């Protein structure tokens, strides 16, 4: 299991938080995703044998947010 914190721009409300967390947890291999609106990031616990950083970044960007 691995943990990464991904910087995300454009999140400002609970809808944003829910959209990003849901997009990530729907990926096979992601166990948890915890968005911090204040910090502008999401902490993700995942199995790096099943999911990659580019896949997670794509899932976030598909929701309309920018990944740094």
Swiss-Prot record:
MF GO annotations: copper ion binding
GO cellular component: cytoplasm
Main location: cytoplasm
Keywords: Chaperone, Copper, Cytoplasm, Metal-binding
Keyword Chaperone: yes
Keyword Metal-binding: yes
CDD domains referenced in this protein's UniProt entry, alphabetically: HMA (cd00371)
Record-linked PROSITE patterns: HMA_1 (PS01047), HMA_2 (PS50846)
Span of domain HMA: 2-68
Signal peptide: none
Tree of life domain: Bacteria
InterPro entries linked: CopZ, Heavy-metal-associated_CS, HMA_Cu_ion-bd, HMA_dom, HMA_dom_sf, MerP/CopZ
Cell location: Cytoplasm
Binding positions for Cu cation per the UniProt entry: 13, 16
PANTHER family assigned to the protein according to its UniProt record, in alphabetical order: P-TYPE CATION-TRANSPORTING ATPASE (PTHR46594:SF4)
Protein role: Chaperone that serves for the intracellular sequestration and transport of Cu(+). Delivers Cu(+) to the copper-exporting P-type ATPase A (CopA).
Entry protein name: Copper chaperone CopZ
Annotated source species: Staphylococcus saprophyticus subsp. saprophyticus (strain ATCC 15305 / DSM 20229 / NCIMB 8711 / NCTC 7292 / S-41)
